[in-house]
Each structure stands twice: as C-alpha cells, then as structure tokens.
C-alpha cells in the first residue's frame, strides 16, 4: 500500500510530519478520510481531532480551525492552533488540558466543543 505524506503546521512551526496510511480530518461539512490517490481539494477545517493512522499505530492532533490541501500523494494542513495528543499518561493529561483550552478559545458553540472534548478524552 502506498503511503500518504502529511504535514501539520501552525504559525509557530511544524507540529507533525510523516508518511501515513490514512488521515481523518474535521471538515466544516463533516469528517472525511483521505487515502493515497485521493482527489485534489482545498477545504476549511473546523475545531476537532485529526486522526492519523501510521503503519503500526494511531495518533491524534486537536486543532481549533485551519485549512487542508489534499493531493494524490500528500495532505498539508495549516492550522491556527494544534495540540499533539501523546500516548503517555503524563503527556496525555497535559495535552488534553491544552487541547481543551485551545478548543474553548476557538468556538462559542459549547455543544461542538463538548463533543470534541469527549472524543479526545476517550482516546
């Protein structure tokens, strides 16, 4: 299976880069998945969680909003703010706290924020 290149960038610098099997993005019209060979598109992203599937694990990044450019071979994400949610218990608790702050600052829609936070806490 061909791998997709992905990069997640915020104004402060790069949050994530790598080759992945698939990625699920929080589009404004709903979540959508991207595999190698996807049609070209540019889309707006809403507050949510980017789900990244590598060859041997799943990784998650919370974003407040941004844009994604999708081509056949890569996905480039420019987000206003992002928090990489690490797997370790200490790192995870800190990341969840930072993600919660990021999302609460991004939206006044408490229902949407609560939904995303519930998803993050279940990881």
Give, region by region, the residue ranges found by the protein language model.
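Compact, glycine-rich, soluble single-domain proteins
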Residues: 9-100
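Structured alpha/beta interaction-core segments
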Residues: 4-8
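Charge/polar-rich, low-complexity and marginally structured segments
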Residues: 89-123
């Amino acid at each position: 299976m061909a791998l997709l290149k992905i990069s997640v960038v915020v104004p402060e610098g790069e949050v994530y880069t790598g080759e992945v099997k698939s990625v699920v993005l929080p589009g404004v019209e709903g979540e959508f998945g991207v595999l190698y060979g996807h049609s070209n598109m540019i889309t707006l992203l809403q507050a949510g969680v980017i789900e990244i599937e590598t060859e041997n694990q799943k990784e998650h990044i919370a974003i407040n909003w941004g844009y994604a450019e999708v081509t056949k071979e890569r996905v480039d994400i420019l987000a206003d703010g992002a928090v990489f949610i690490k797997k370790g218990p200490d790192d995870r608790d800190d990341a969840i706290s930072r993600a919660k702050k990021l999302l609460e600052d991004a939206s006044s829609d408490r229902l949407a924020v609560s939904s995303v936070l519930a998803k993050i806490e279940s990881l």
